[in-house]
């Protein structure tokens, strides 16, 4: 069977790095290629806390309408134009029987004893990154709160064969901020990496 290519944003990228690291330790191939979207082993803790704060906002009370949710997102990301069509936002919210909208993620992800910490197991992430031998692309939002220029530089040192794209006018949510540029970059990488991935 053909191994998959993993495109992981934020927590998905962390999972991808760790999974590939475990594959490498076991002497298995794992993924054909890896695309990390605004995530590196070295994370800016202020940015992590800002993201967690946003995720925790209105967690219990929810929103009275999609418009209220859109206003909250606009305050968190003032540089992103507020969408006129909120149908896309509706996919990230759940309408409960009480008529209010709630984020689609499990509240225990934020409030539970196993809530994410940006500094959790940084050594494991570093080791996983060092084990990356497959084609790897790091896509950073130039306005990211999470991945600094220095963090991207350190990643390039740890994974010298990796490629790097810095997307202007994009924050941590690169695909949402500049979807056309993000998609083109990923497709270009996959097209060029296909021969290498098939023989690695």
Predicted segment positions?
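C-terminal alpha-helix
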Residues: 185-196
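Internal catalytic or translocation cores that form aromatic/hydrophobic pockets or channels
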Residues: 36-78
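Conserved hydrolase catalytic core segment
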Residues: 1-47
